[in-house]
Swiss-Prot record:
Cross-referenced InterPro entries: YcgL-like_sf (IPR038068), YcgL_dom (IPR027354)
Protein name per its UniProtKB record: YcgL domain-containing protein Sama_1929
YcgL domain span: 1-85
HAMAP family: UPF0745
A Pfam entry, by short name: YcgL
Species annotation: Shewanella amazonensis (strain ATCC BAA-1098 / SB2B)
């Protein structure tokens, strides 16, 4: 299975995987509006991959088959001040 991976023109580190290049027919319109203009990053052969960067490859395959797309959001940002306070033993 080969899928197309697009990055968002509006949201940093946000990617949309679709089964066919330039086929967004299964992606809900509100999601496409939030996503902005999809910018093609790569065509990705999922059947030859065992691991992806931060996405669970089994979940990507499953959602592509069931929903027709997979949306990868950026990981949550660490709050450095909270982490520093925790390291110092200071509770909020």
């Amino acid at each position: 299975m080969i899928c197309a991976v697009y990055k968002s023109s509006r949201k940093q580190e946000t990617y949309l995987f679709v089964p066919k290049r330039d086929d967004f027919s299964q992606v809900p319109e509100p999601l496409l509006q939030m996503f902005g203009t999809p910018l093609l990053v790569m065509l990705l052969p999922l059947d030859r991959k065992e691991k992806l960067g931060i996405a669970d490859i089994d979940k990507v395959r499953s959602e592509l088959a069931q929903k027709g797309y997979y949306l990868q959001l950026p990981p949550p940002k660490d709050n450095l001040l909270t982490q520093h306070r925790r390291d110092l033993g200071i509770e909020d």
